C-alpha cells in the first residue's frame, strides 16, 4: 500500500434518469485511473454511496473486481449502523480488494471511546488494511487524536484520510501515531500537507485529470511546490456546489461520462456555472503542456 501516493475518490456515473449505474462510463473512468497507476476509492462520499442501495453497492464492487484492473482498490465502509456495516464487511471479505475507507460515524457525534469501540469492531472484521476517514464537515465530529492513539497498534489500521481543512490535524495524528500514514483529503491542500509529511492524496480532481494530478502530487511529494496558487484555484472550482456535482458536470462536459446526473438530495441545478469549470480545465491542461515542454 505504501507505494501508492495518489488515490482517486471515484464518482459513480448514472444513466440520464439516475435510476441505474452507467457501468460503461464507470469502466472508462477506472481504466484511465489504472493506466495512470492511481489507486481507486469506490463508494465514498464522492461516489454517492449513501444514495445507492445495498444491491447496487454489491453489484458495483463485483463489477469492478471482475475488470481485474492493474491497480489497487479501496472500498468505502459506511459509518451509520454497526450491524449493517459489519454485514458489508462480511460481503467484502470475498472480494479481491486491497483496503477499506472507514468513515467516522456520522450524525451520532461519538466521543473518544465511542469512536474507539466502533473502529475496533470494524477493524476486527476487516480482512485487509483500513484507512480511517476524518471528515468533520460531513460526520459532524472529528476523528479524535486520542482515538487514533488508542487504535494505533491494531494490525489492520494502516492510514488516515484527513479532510479537516487544516495542517494542524495531520501534525496531531503524526504525533500520537507516528506509525500511521496520513493522506491529504483535500486537493487544494496537498502542497502544504506534503510539506508536513503527508503520505499522499485522496483526490476528487483526479477523476477529471488523472495524469496531471498524479504528476502534480509526485512533485509535491518530492519537495517541489509547482504553481500552488493556480492549482488551488482550479481545485476549488470542483467544490462550487456539493461534491460530486461539479466534478460530474465537468466529466460530462469533456465527454468522459454520458450523463452528469446525481441522485437526490443532490441536484445539478445547484451548480452556479459550467464556465468556471471549463476555465479550470483549461488552466490545468495549460499546466500540463507547460510541464511537458
UniProtKB/Swiss-Prot annotation:
Residues annotated to bind pyruvate: 46, 202
Pathway stated in the Swiss-Prot or TrEMBL entry: Amino-acid biosynthesis; L-lysine biosynthesis via DAP pathway; (S)-tetrahydrodipicolinate from L-aspartate: step 3/4
SUPFAM superfamilies: Aldolase
InterPro entries recorded: Aldolase_TIM (IPR013785), DapA (IPR005263), DapA-like (IPR002220), Schiff_base-form_aldolases_AS (IPR020625), Schiff_base-form_aldolases_CS (IPR020624)
Subcellular location: Cytoplasm
Keywords: Amino-acid biosynthesis, Cytoplasm, Diaminopimelate biosynthesis, Lyase, Lysine biosynthesis, Schiff base
A biological process term (GO) from this entry: diaminopimelate biosynthetic process
Signal peptide boundaries: none
Subunit structure: Homotetramer; dimer of dimers.
The family this protein is said to belong to: Belongs to the DapA family.
Protein name: 4-hydroxy-tetrahydrodipicolinate synthase
The organism of origin for this protein: Wolbachia pipientis subsp. Culex pipiens (strain wPip)
Gene name linked to the record: dapA
